[in-house]
Amino acid sequence: MTLGEKICTLRTGKGLSQEDLAAKLEVSRQSVSKWETGQSVPDLEKIIKLADLFGVNVD
């Protein structure tokens, strides 16, 4: 499973839209979409915020 697939799975599991997640991370919805489709990757700060938000470790 890619990082993007994990983000998408965790996001949908929490019932969040891409816009909801983007607002929580203070990024654009397009950024979230690009992460989920593998067109880009979040920076370390955002990865840490994602881990905290979803209650997972960064591994």
Question: Can you describe what each PLM-predicted range is?
Answer:
Residues T12, A23, D52:
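Alpha-helical residues within the helix-turn-helix
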Residues G15-K34:
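Short alpha-helical DNA-recognition segment
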Residues M1-G13:
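A short, Lys/Arg-rich alpha-helix, primarily the initiator
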Residues E45-D59:
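DNA major-groove recognition helix of helix-turn-helix/homeodomain DNA-binding modules
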Residues M1, L16, V56:
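Short beta-to-alpha loop/turn elements within the nucleotide-binding domains of ABC transporters
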Residues C8, E19, I48:
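Residues within the helices of the helix-turn-helix
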